């Protein structure tokens, strides 16, 4: 599969402006009026010409501040959520981020970006592939991206070696079997806030909503970086889907070597 054939979505945690203002900015760029949908997440939405919803939502984990740095109320906790996108939508995402930045949006303390890639093409084998690939690459990726230490330990933990080992020993044949290993025999797929989601490679998202979620990125309003983050996730996913297998043996070796140095 060409990485550009995959569908994806992105969630960007921001502050510096209110959700209402963010929705107005998105609506102006898309040429549509924002709609306040309300609910627990105090959601605003803007439909594009294709009828897709671009959302602005409340996220309790965001540290709310005004652009000048003064503390702010909950209305400044802004999560920008795209609809299901195709590769050709990346420039639109970039321009929306630019417009939000011009309106005062900033990447707050400990804020993150989550990229979701469509998991429909995945099998048990390719889920094992992507787990092994991430185990291999995540140390280098974390260093290159300068992932915030607090976020790493709290919201985007690295692949658990116990999960990796059991996955490779059992070589599950079905996604249901992968799910049993992920949840350690306890079915948590129907719980949106299951604690297992706080991993760089979040497979809870596969079982709960049908997407591979990458959670490691620090938030930013730099449109070029956001494009790179999306491309990185699509490339890793395409590698997992395209190669016949991925072994963790050399990866364990690499991680041990880096720890010693």
Which residue ranges define each predicted feature?
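Histidine-centered divalent-metal-coordination microenvironment in nucleic-acid enzymes
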Residues: 106-122, 211-215
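A common structural junction motif
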Residues: 29-34, 100-107, 137-139, 234-244
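Short, conserved secondary-structure transition motifs
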Residues: 116-123, 153-160, 254
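Beta-strand-rich recognition/accessory modules
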Residues: 197-200, 208-245
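Conserved small/polar residues in nucleotide/adenosyl-binding loops
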Residues: 252-261
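Aromatic/basic-lined ligand-recognition segments
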Residues: 55-58, 128-218
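Helical (often loop-to-helix) elements that flank the catalytic cores of nucleotide-handling enzymes
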Residues: 28, 89-96, 120-145, 221-237
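Terminal catalytic/cofactor-binding subdomain
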Residues: 1-102
